[in-house]
Amino acid sequence: MRPPADPGARRRATHGRGLSAEGLALLVLMLKGYRPLARRFAAAGGEIDLIVRRGRTIAFVEVKARATLDAAATAIDARKRARVSRAARAWLARHPLAAGATLRADAVFVAPRRWPRHLPNAFEIEGL
C-alpha cells in the first residue's frame, strides 16, 4: 500500500497507527496486572504515551510501532528519552502521592502480526 501523497494525510495516518499501538500496548499491560493512570500525558516539553501502576511501581511507558519489533526497539533515542524524563518529572510534581513508589521507564514495542514486547526498565529516567 502506498502512503498518502498529502503530508497532512500521512501525518494523520501515522497518528492513527500510534493511537492503535498505544491501545494495544495498554491492553497487554493490563493483562499483566497494570492499571492505567494516564494516556498521552504532555508537559514540560515532553510526552509520555502511557503511565501505569502495578502495586507500588509506576511505569512511564514509551510505545513504539514499527514494521518489526527490532526496528521498534531501536527507535528510542537520547532525545526521546530526555522528553519522556522531562514529562515524568512534571507528572510526579503534580502527583505528590506517587513519591513513595518505585519509578521506572518501560517500553512496549509493537509490530504487525506480532505480540507486543514489553521491556521493563528500558531506560533511566533522567533527573530522578
Swiss-Prot record:
Coiled coil: none annotated. It comes from the Bacteria. SUPFAM superfamilies: Restriction endonuclease-like. GO terms for molecular function: nucleic acid binding. PANTHER family: UPF0102 PROTEIN YRAN. Belongs to the UPF0102 family. This is UPF0102 protein Mext_0406.
